[in-house]
UniProtKB/Swiss-Prot annotation:
GO terms for cellular component: plasma membrane. It is a single-pass type I membrane protein. It is an enzyme of class 2 (transferase). Keywords: ATP-binding, Cell membrane, Glycoprotein, Kinase, Leucine-rich repeat, Membrane, Nucleotide-binding, Phosphoprotein, Receptor, Repeat, Serine/threonine-protein kinase, Signal, Transferase, Transmembrane, Transmembrane helix. This is Probable leucine-rich repeat receptor-like protein kinase At1g68400. Gene3D superfamilies: Phosphorylase Kinase, domain 1 (3.30.200.20), Ribonuclease Inhibitor (3.80.10.10), Transferase(Phosphotransferase) domain 1 (1.10.510.10). It comes from Arabidopsis thaliana. Residues 296-670 are cytoplasmic. Residues 30-274 are extracellular. Pfam families: LRR_1, LRRNT_2, Pkinase. The lineage of its organism: Eukaryota, Viridiplantae, Streptophyta, Embryophyta, Tracheophyta.
Length: 670
């Protein structure tokens, strides 16, 4: 009887596996047919010859799959034509990029593509109204419909796309008023070159002027102030105000300024002699000239006082709004820029909400802390916008103007939900400022080590694991963003992992280590890879080591450079202490006592400990790449991360639409 029961269970399990396999095969076959139908109508030049029935569709040009379903379709600049209606059957699609083609017609109903995160359809011939089905794609992070022939109004339901980071609608024929798109995460926004009218909503008014230009009837900040011409005849300011007043009947309204005194007196002016008229005019002219000179003298004197008072603040101030979409001041007009650069200028990256340098100087400031690269401040601007400003005056001693600007161009291009993105920078001979988004929930260091008194709320395991995964994704994105330069962070530590309003980890201060004096690096000994002790340069492998130390800090609750050995009372670095404890088979002694209150997490903690020990291998070649570390951590968490808009292809970020074109920018010293 037992054998029969076992046989039945085994048979049922086999049937379920077979059914699942059939379903996956059927779905894969459906995706294959969908792509072949699209090829028949769109590929008139034969660029998709690899798409045929004899090969696996997951190996076709521009196609990526997950579990035999098409999840990514990137077909850019290959002269595709026709409609994209057939693609709506690709229900597992996460990334769709068809920019720089000749596709046309209206956008079909995309509501079936519920997994879509990135949609790039720019530089085509699409037409019709804004595709309202897009507003139902609640996982969407980036939407680019620019340089097409769309028309009509923008639906206010765009506010339902709460994760949206990019909204590019420039160079179309959209009209009507811009809706109040109040999306807190929106970073990259442009509606220039359309037919919008009315006032710019307050929620968008701090984006640069360039993103609203070429809309003749658009007004309000940052464009010209709207002038309200009321059609209400009772409103003041109209030339025919007397007609409009309810106190005047139409028949009593004067037709000329003098007729109110009667018709006879209007002829008296003709009796005034010519000499008297000239005398009156000369007298008025002399009086007006005297008053004008007096006012000019008073105002000029006040202006001179103010100019002298504020000359140090205002001298050489110049705000540059970058295009393309990043600053290119180091590439053109070298002589002019050198002159401006000596005095100082502020450069904003496109999509950043603008403000004047004076606004920053007037803002209420709160010091957040001092680090190896300078002092960080929280600045609250007059409009309530909060930014973080890092002052590098004392730290950046080895970088020249050209080297500094080239590095800023590269760093300013990096955009990811797990990075604290660089918004703007100011460069002058005596002052260097970096402007970032303000992260209100502090740093990982403070959450782990701050206020360990009795009233403290400990950091639970789920939150620690989420922070570890987010920081890993951010660092992996930096490493994969530009293969030719092999970018590094250079200073991974818990104070450089910040938390945004949603509790997501964001890596900060990346790419600044090349400017730091050697003594600054020495202060991060607890995180420093062994190979850096003899003065070698930072590498991606040394970043991996530092990240491994960070994981050990999360697991143990101990500061990396403050671990006591227990017998001698001396201190030892955290990786060596963990290795010694594990070697003596006291693994449970490694973990933070605050984690012991949680049940059924020991297996996950041991798994993360193994990752940390692999990252802190003494030999750099034995350490894993960050892309692999991300996968290992996500496996512990129990699946892929839906929170990251750039999770697809994290090891090939250069080819990912998560990045703008030419991520590497110009050459830079690294």
């Amino acid at each position: 009887m037992a054998k029969s029961s076992f046989f039945n269970k085994h048979l049922l399990l086999s049937l379920l596996i077979l059914l699942q396999s059939c379903l996956l095969s059927s779905s894969s076959s459906t995706d294959s047919e969908t792509l072949l139908n699209f090829k028949l109508t769109a590929d008139s030049t034969g660029k998709l010859n690899s798409w045929n029935t004899t090969t696996n569709p997951c190996q076709w040009t521009g196609v990526s799959c997950n579990r035999n379903r098409v999840t990514r379709l990137v077909l850019e600049d290959i002269n595709l034509t026709g409609s994209i209606s057939s693609l709506t059957s690709l229900t597992s699609l996460r990334v769709l990029s068809l920019k720089h083609n000749n596709l046309s017609g209206p956008i079909p109903n995309l509501s079936n593509l519920t997994a879509l995160k990135l949609l790039f359809l720019s530089n085509n011939q699409f037409s019709g109204n804004f595709p309202t089905s897009i507003t139902s794609l609640t996982r969407l992070y980036r939407l680019d419909l620019s340089f097409n022939n769309f028309s009509g109004q923008i639906p206010p339901d765009l506010t339902d796309l709460t994760h949206l980071l990019t909204l590019r609608l420039e160079s179309n024929r959209f009209s009507g008023q811009i809706p109040n798109i109040n999306l807190s995460d929106l970073q990259d926004f442009n509606v220039s070159g359309n037919n919008f009218n009315g006032q710019i909503p307050n929620s968008l008014s701090q984006f640069p002027e360039s993103v609203f230009t070429q809309n003749p009837s658009l007004c309000g900040a940052p464009l010209l102030k709207c002038t309200k011409l009321s059609s209400d005849p009772t409103k003041p300011g109209r030339p025919d105000e007397a007609k409009a007043s309810p106190l005047n009947k139409p028949e009593t309204v004067p037709s000329s300024p003098t007729s109110i005194h009667g018709g006879d007196k209007s002829n008296n002016t003709s009796r005034i002699s010519t000499i008297s008229l000239i005398a009156i005019i000369l007298g008025d002219f002399i009086i007006l000239s005297f008053v004008s000179l007096l006012l000019y003298y008073c105002f000029w004197r006040q202006y001179a006082v103010n100019k002298k008072k504020h000359s140090k603040i205002l001298e050489g101030e110049k705000i540059v709004y970058s295009s393309n979409p990043y600053p290119t001041s180091t590439q053109n007009n070298n002589n002019q820029n050198q002159q401006v650069g000596d005095k100082g200028k502020m450069v904003f990256f496109e999509g950043t909400r603008r403000f004047e340098l004076e606004d920053l100087l007037r803002a209420s400031a709160e010091m957040l802390g001092k680090g190896g690269f300078g002092t960080a401040y929280k600045a609250v601007l007059e409009d309530g916008n909060e930014v973080a400003v890092k002052r590098l005056k004392d730290a950046v001693t080895v970088a020249g103007k050209k080297e500094f600007e080239q590095q800023m161009e590269v760093l300013g291009r990096l955009r990811h939900t797990n990075l604290v993105s660089l918004k703007a920078y100011y460069f002058a001979r005596e002052e260097k400022l970096l402007v970032y988004d303000y992260m209100p929930n502090g740093s990982l260091f403070w959450l782990l080590h701050g206020n360990r008194g009795p009233g403290r709320t400990p950091l639970d395991w789920t939150t620690r694991l989420k922070i570890a995964a987010g920081a890993a994704r951010g660092l992996a994105f930096i490493h994969g963003s530009c293969k030719t330069l092999k970018l590094t962070h250079g200073d991974i530590k818990s104070t450089n992992v910040l938390l945004d309003r949603s509790g997501n980890a964001r890596v900060s201060d990346f790419g600044l280590s090349i400017f730091a004096p050697s003594q600054t690096v020495a202060k991060s000994n607890g995180y420093r890879a062994p190979e850096l002790i003899d003065g070698r340069k930072h590498t991606q492998k040394s970043d991996v080591y530092s990240f491994g130390v960070l994981l050990l800090e999360i697991l143990t609750g101990k500061c990396p450079n403050m671990v006591e050995t227990g017998h001698s009372g001396g201190a030892v670095d955290l990786p060596r202490w963990v290795q010694s404890v594990v070697r003596e088979e006291w693994t449970a002694e490694v973990f933070d006592l605050e984690l012991m209150r949680y049940k059924d997490i020991e297996e996950e903690m041991v798994g993360l400990l193994q990752i940390a020990m692999a990252c802190t291998a003494v030999a750099a070649d034995h350490r894993p790449k960050m892309g692999h570390v991300v996968k290992l951590i996500e496996d512990i968490r129990g699946g892929g991360s839906e929170a990251s808009p750039c999770n697809d292809g994290i090891n090939s970020a250069v080819d990912s639409p998560c990045l703008s074109e030419d991520t590497c920018g110009g050459t830079t010293s690294q």
